């Protein structure tokens, strides 16, 4: 607080004797910017999430993927990966590429998740437009799914999905981008399915020290 007062004085915003430190502290407290509040925020941001079984927590996300060719003229379109990752096992129970990041894509993927594995206890997503749909929130409520949403622009609170996206880009999408001919959306999804089944789900994960498929199956 003293440093802030010194800055205000040097910039001639206030005279040194006109602003008490206690007054400034009160304003910070009301605005949620006190040291105590900021320390609490820091702990919340980097708090480690612990789960003990599969589908206790599932994380959903969209991210920009490689280009695909679309239509009779083979126009290049950016594909978007939309998927769900199980926190406990790092298994991907549902994931595919779409041409749009919208409610229709979310609805399709969400249905596939439920049909294949049933509802998770908690579903963690960001504040993307698709996740704000009233019908999506109503569906989660009707199914007894606790819907948790990360704060906007706080990617560090979603470390699991960020790490998966990095793995997806480095191991799979980089290979796709290196090809001479753009794939169709169906081809891209077929390759993704094979990569998940034969590579990602079988490789030992550095944090769990188990392969995602094995850890998911045993829990």
Residue ranges and their predicted role:
Residues 22, 26-83, 91-92, 103-112, ...:
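Mobile-element integrase/transposase regions
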Residues 171-219:
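Active-site-proximal acidic segments at structured loop/helix or strand boundaries
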Residues 97-102:
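A short acidic/small-residue loop/turn micro-motif
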Residues 6, 22, 26, 190:
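DNA-binding alpha-helical recognition surfaces that contact promoter or target DNA
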Residues 90-95, 148-150:
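Short small-residue beta-strand/loop micro-motif enriched in glycine and branched aliphatics
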Residues 123-127, 131-143, 147-173, 183-189, ...:
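RNase H-like two-metal-ion nuclease catalytic core shared by retroviral integrases
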Residues 62, 87, 127:
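Residues immediately flanking
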Residues 1-20, 63-70:
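A short, amphipathic alpha-helix used for macromolecular contacts
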């Amino acid at each position: 607080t003293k440093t802030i007062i010194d800055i205000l004085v040097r910039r001639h915003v206030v005279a040194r004797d006109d602003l008490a430190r206690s007054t400034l502290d009160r304003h910070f407290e009301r605005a949620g910017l006190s040291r105590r509040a900021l320390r609490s925020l820091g702990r919340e941001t980097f708090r480690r999430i612990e789960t003990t079984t599969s589908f206790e927590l599932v994380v959903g996300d969209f991210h920009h993927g490689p280009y695909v060719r679309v239509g009779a003229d083979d126009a290049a379109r950016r594909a978007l990966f939309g998927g769900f990752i199980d926190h406990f096992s790092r298994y991907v129970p549902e994931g595919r590429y779409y041409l749009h990041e919208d409610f229709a894509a979310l609805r399709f993927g969400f249905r596939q998740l439920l049909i294949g594995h049933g509802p998770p206890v908690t579903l963690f997503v960001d504040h993307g437009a698709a996740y704000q749909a009233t019908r999506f929130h109503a569906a989660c409520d009707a199914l007894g799914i606790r819907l948790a949403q990360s704060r906007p622009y706080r990617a560090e609170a979603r470390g699991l999905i960020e790490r998966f996206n990095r793995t997806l880009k480095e191991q799979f999408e980089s290979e796709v981008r290196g090809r001479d001919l753009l794939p169709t959306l169906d081809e891209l999804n077929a390759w993704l399915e094979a990569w998940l089944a034969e590579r990602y789900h079988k490789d030992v994960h550095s944090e769990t020290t188990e392969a995602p498929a094995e850890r998911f199956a045993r829990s």
